[in-house]
Amino acid sequence: VYVWRTRGVVMAALMGVGALGGLMMLPSRRQEMEVSEASAMGRVESWYEGIQMFIGSPVFGIGAGGYSDLHELTAHNSFVLVLAETGIVGFTVWLAIVGYCFRMMLAIVERGDDIIDDVPLEVPDEVALKDWKTDKALSLCLLLSLTGFFTAAFFLSRSYVVILYLLVALVVGHYTRMRATYPSLPVFSLEKDLIRWPSYAVIGVIGLYLTVKVLLAMA
């Protein structure tokens, strides 16, 4: 999250991939880090099967619950599962929901204390600043919760679990209240992002495909 906030998404992604590659090349007794280890290889093969299902039905996918009907294991990757079962259309929508949650919390966390100028003049500055610090801390907590959940979700099938959508509801509710209190916070609208999310979805598909190919080649 720190690298993402200070250096940007691309740098964070590159550092993440580099760190993963470095860990996998280090000699270690932690067998779960080895791609060639049986359970890890089974996980990668599950990702590969999900990609193949997507290639077979790229627009709307194979349908909810279809992955487990066609493969003996779960996808072990929430992104692959959504991609396989809902196609590029569903993946784009799901990615937009996730992406907006991150953008909302980042918009608050990255905002300076000058935002208290939005607060009515009758509220003392020290009170307004204290309330803003509390709201900002809560936003950071929600951002870290999102980060933790989706870090785990990359290795587990958690695409449809209720806890995800409760977390989404908390984030949206919190941002709605923050927008009412601090009107200078940005408004997020699909009308402004009609190109953004389909583009990110395509980039995500390519990234997943290349990741699987690299891991299979390393096995």
Where are these regions (language model features)?
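Hydrophobic transmembrane alpha-helices and their immediate junctions
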Residues: 1, 88-145, 171, 176
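Transmembrane-embedded, aromatic-rich helix segments that form part
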Residues: 1, 10-15, 91-96, 161-166
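Structural signature of transmembrane alpha-helix termini at the membrane-water interface
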Residues: 1-4, 22-27, 96-109, 154-158, ...
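TM-adjacent membrane-interface loops and short helices in multi-pass inner/ER membrane proteins
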Residues: 37-94
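Generic hydrophobic alpha-helical scaffold/packing signal
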Residues: 51, 80, 84, 93, ...
